Amino acid sequence: MNGIIPVVPPTEAEVRAALETLGMLDRVSCSYCGDTSTEWDHLRPLVSNQRPTGYISEIHNLVPACGKCNQSKGNKDWLTWMRSTAPLSPRSRGVADIEDRIARLQEYERQASPTRVDFEAAVGPDLWQRHWAHHKHLLELMRLADQDAQEIRTRVREAHEAKRQAAT
């Protein structure tokens, strides 16, 4: 799925501007909870219901995050998730300055909202439908290959056991 979603590498100036808006020029931390940042999270999800949402990997859709928050948030709406009782969400972890963090993220989105692209309109319906037909076919081939692999494992295990029994 991610193979069709473009990645736009940010410039140093764009990263600096993003960190400035988020109040992190001196110390980069998780935008959601304040813990040590270990990665960049897509503020708006790239994929939902096994389809691209239209958002891409660009600096305006990325914020510093810790692994706990990134994994817990997944592809949920960031604001709803922050205020939710989902495991490891800022609210469920008792983050004291949650409303300040929300305000900074809202300002970040106001200053440079993530770009949303209608993928099908951009590439045309023929290519789009062809891609998804190939995708469906590939998933079916992977399912069949997995069945074959299971059968191979079973037969090799049986051959192994037969050889061990013959040796005793």
Label every PLM stretch briefly.
Residues N2, R27-S31, V63-A65, C69, ...:
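Short, well-ordered helical secondary-structure segments
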Residues P45, A122, Q150-I152:
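A generic signature of intrinsically disordered, low-complexity regions enriched in glycine/proline
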Residues M1-S29, Q50-R51, D97-E99, A103-Y108:
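Short, charged surface segments at domain edges that flank catalytic/cofactor-binding sites
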